[in-house]
């Protein structure tokens, strides 16, 4: 039973490629619960997946076209356009990463499995430290958990 639980945890498809970085304690309560699929979970999961697809495909992918055009031929653009492209790239990066996280969390949510959130409005942070605590939260927790190991 223990081997099966560990194998399921390590091979859990929504987090294996994209994240979020999960600890055993984060998911064991819902990952191993034999619960039937509920309409509420399916609705919430689908909503989160669609929101993630919107962020990734509509916002991030469209910004990528503009940013790539400026970055490839930056010498022919003014400083203001390059600054706008840099800001757009920051938004693109966030929308792509958080959109993928929304899809992962939504996919797990379809089955009633709760995964930790990975973003908490990082661009509203007032300090660099606060930004780091809000951006890729699970990576920060992973580093914090291992600081005594290193």
Predicted regions and their residues:
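Membrane-embedded transmembrane alpha-helical bundles that form the catalytic cores
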Residues: 1-150
């Amino acid at each position: 039973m223990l081997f099966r639980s560990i194998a399921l945890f390590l091979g859990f498809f929504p987090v294996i490629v994209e994240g979020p970085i999960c600890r055993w304690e984060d998911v064991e309560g819902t990952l191993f619960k034999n619960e039937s699929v509920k309409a509420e979970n399916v609705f919430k999961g689908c909503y989160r997946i669609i929101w993630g697809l919107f962020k990734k495909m509509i916002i991030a992918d469209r910004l990528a076209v503009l940013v790539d055009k400026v970055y490839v031929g930056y010498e022919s653009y003014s400083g203001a356009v390059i600054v706008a492209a840099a800001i757009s790239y920051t938004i693109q990066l966030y929308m792509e990463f958080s959109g993928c996280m929304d899809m992962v969390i939504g996919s797990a949510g379809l089955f009633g499995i709760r995964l930790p959130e990975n973003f908490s409005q990082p661009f509203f942070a007032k300090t660099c430290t606060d930004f780091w605590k809000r951006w890729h939260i699970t990576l920060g927790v992973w580093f914090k958990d291992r600081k005594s190991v290193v």
